[in-house]
């Protein structure tokens, strides 16, 4: 008689979960085996397995149609199959699972064969010279001694080395972050993550790995977390200039938001109140327009360069961006400066070879000096003046748009915001609008934000007024989609579009395009690039507030109407169990 612990999880509702559980229980008991089944469904986890039960088990059987974390079963043989096979071929599934109990050294397995535990790790310390690499070596040696597969990304003073790929992260069972600096963990959404200090990994890698298995935390799986995971997956697949540009934009955004809203607040006291020196409006204008807005382009350039060359790119990028401001080259000059500084710094970093004893001079002396000099001279003598002329011409054209041309531009920008919901096309429209804020051109920003809000809002409204066209899971997600839409997070529409792209995507594109066109036609202006409905409460953040809200409402209603027209009603039985 063998002791079996099992987990069942159907991808659609509770039916498959319970059918598989009952089939396994009945068949195992008929064969004289002990079995305990943990059931996963949309309603939560039923009858969770206890540590003592897992420890006493001879084998673990996972019948699931979605990913189930199996790190807690690391010391046991684990057999995986689908819920459908567990229902239709129960005896064969049990026989194949029990065949694993004869292994001398039980390892995590799948129904395609054995495999060791897969770990990905990041190590980083403030100085980045010694402890980063010592921690990486310690984790590698300890994992190898246990027969585990491990990949370690080091984030040192000369940038990231052995960067983890999206495929490595996707395949990993466990993530370990040993760092004394901030490490972005958004790309590990849905994974079991354990964080510790770099010193702990150096002094006790074995303890760190043991603690990671026992204490690691899995990121959540509600709609908001799903959206975050999708965004992280998209970020992981970005490469080349597109990735570098979006990195710069993401770091620039807080400055644009803070600066724009402070400028708007200065107008509360009167449109020209800031002209009186020593007053609060003058101070707010100095902070927002005089400081925050002046830093926008340098930060954009600095972090484009940082994305390309890591830390060595930051100094020449920031200085190149400041030169772009001084040369009136604006955000276009900042983009050029960022890419120039990044590639120059990366080339110097790779080309300059020093003895190990002098390696510490590269990040603090040699690279900043040479990369800044080269970038600065090219900006001053080659790039600055032509780019400034291009920016001036583009700004004059946009500010002189007639109503018809403004509507066309709004249609294009609005549609782009909904095409891929946070993807490259969406980000191209958004980056274009944000960049124009530095030239005091605010209409495209208003159109872009309004158009980015309507996809999740339209879907959320549709789940309320046309419940027979959505599953229970989708109807439940509608509330979260509404919050994401109000917050200007277009990605809230992705889970709906992924399930029914042929009907959802055309509906949201039309709704967003109409919203963008209305916003431009009605002369709406927006000085802040983010915030959704929450920024509308700030006086003077939006010009023509009532008409702007009307644009969003109309686009939302159009989206909802098209969804109702295109989506067919779902049978009642399927709506109830999905």
From Swiss-Prot:
Please report the stretch or stretches of sequence annotated as the PTS EIIB type-2 domain: 1-99, 119-214
Kindly report, in one word, the top-level EC class recorded for this enzyme: transferase
TM segment ranges: 251-271, 284-304, 319-339, 364-384, 405-425, 428-450, 477-497, 518-538, 545-565
- Where does the protein end up? Cell inner membrane
Topologically, how does it sit relative to the membrane?
A: Multi-pass membrane protein
- What start and end residues bound the annotated signal peptide? none
**EC code:** 2.7.1.202
One GO biological process term is:
phosphoenolpyruvate-dependent sugar phosphotransferase system
Q: What induces it?
A: By fructose.
Instruction: Using the record's annotation, list all stretches that form the PTS EIIC type-2 domain.
Output: 241-576
Annotated function = The phosphoenolpyruvate-dependent sugar phosphotransferase system (sugar PTS), a major carbohydrate active transport system, catalyzes the phosphorylation of incoming sugar substrates concomitantly with their translocation across the cell membrane. The enzyme II FruAB PTS system is involved in fructose transport.
Note on domains (UniProt): The PTS EIIB type-2 domain is phosphorylated by phospho-EIIA on a cysteinyl residue. Then, it transfers the phosphoryl group to the sugar substrate concomitantly with the sugar uptake processed by the PTS EIIC type-2 domain.
Name of the protein: PTS system fructose-specific EIIB'BC component
Which species does the entry assign this protein to?
A: Rhodobacter capsulatus
Q: What is the lineage of its organism?
A: Bacteria, Pseudomonadati, Pseudomonadota, Alphaproteobacteria, Rhodobacterales
